[in-house]
Regions:
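Asp-based, Mg2+/Mn2+-dependent phosphohydrolase catalytic module
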Residues: 1-12, 130, 139-141, 145-246
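Residues in soluble alpha-helical coiled-coils and helical-bundle/repeat scaffolds
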Residues: 21-25, 116, 120, 193
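Short helix-capping segments at alpha-helix termini
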Residues: 39-43, 87-91, 157-161, 189-190
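A metal-dependent, Asp-based hydrolase signature
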Residues: 56-110
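Short, acidic loop-to-helix structural element flanking the phosphoryl-transfer center
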Residues: 74, 100-101, 105, 109-140
Length: 246
């Protein structure tokens, strides 16, 4: 795809988790810590088994959350309850269901705390954000949980670079719903054809921008597999590629 810029923009919208902030890295560390801290070897043959049960179910829940099929509270709880109930050693665990539910609640709470503590910027994120902020009003558009997102923003040291922050819970709708993008447009006083959205998730960031009639830059993080059914206005392998476009 030709990444030559063909029009000018008045504002830039950008996703946060795994576009600017390294949520995947923070989550990996958090899951490792929790496996040891809460003796999850009682439920699983290995840490790898725990992660193998957690990851696909978590992705499934986030997909349902994006479609308003489950609540935030259900997502937070069930992404840990499900693995606990399906661990290969569950039959040997001598405890009541209420104990497993309580553990899932504890894991859910600690996961949010740990991923926030382990927050870091992705490679090239600070350079990109400061570069873009000199040229455009920047707006974060995120589905992340409000109780931790602002703390991550503060830890980033980039607060002064953003004109607006649009969070799913504060707006009452989420990506890929066009309404969250329309709220960002309203706050910036621009129309859909005057902005571009940057994000790593095709299902929420790119499809959402398409739904709102907004151009997109899809950050694919050097994924080698082809996805011919998924298109974007521009596609880049990393954050440095965005500066070549904008």
């Amino acid at each position: 795809m030709d990444n030559q810029l063909t029009k000018s923009y008045k504002a830039v919208f950008i996703d946060w988790d795994d576009t600017i902030g390294d949520f995947v890295g923070a989550a990996k560390r958090a899951l490792r810590d929790m496996y040891e801290k809460y003796n999850l070897s009682d439920y699983f043959a290995s840490h790898e088994e725990f992660v193998a049960l957690y990851k696909p179910h978590n992705l499934e829940l986030w997909d349902k959350y994006g479609k308003d099929l489950v609540t935030k509270e259900y997502l937070s709880f069930d992404r840990f309850f499900y693995p606990l109930m399906h661990g290969s050693k569950i039959a040997t665990v001598n405890c009541q269901l209420s104990t497993i539910c309580a553990l899932a609640e504890t894991l859910s709470e600690d996961f949010l705390n740990l991923t926030t503590n382990y927050f870091s910027l992705l490679d090239g994120a600070e350079e990109l954000v400061r570069y873009l902020a000199e040229k455009y009003p920047l707006t974060i558009v995120t589905n992340g949980f409000v109780e931790v997102q602002y703390e991550k923003f503060d830890k980033s040291g980039l607060q002064d670079c953003f004109a607006h922050i649009v969070l799913r819970e504060e707006v009452g709708c989420q990506k890929p719903n066009a309404q969250i993008f329309e709220e960002a447009l309203r706050r910036n006083g621009v129309s859909a054809d005057e902005v571009i959205m940057i994000g790593d998730s095709w299902n929420s960031d790119i499809q959402g921008a398409i739904n709102a009639g907004i151009d997109q830059i899809w950050v694919r993080w050097n994924k080698v597999q082809d996805e011919p059914d998924k298109k974007a206005t521009y596609m880049v392998g990393d954050l440095h590629g965005i500066m070549e476009i904008l």
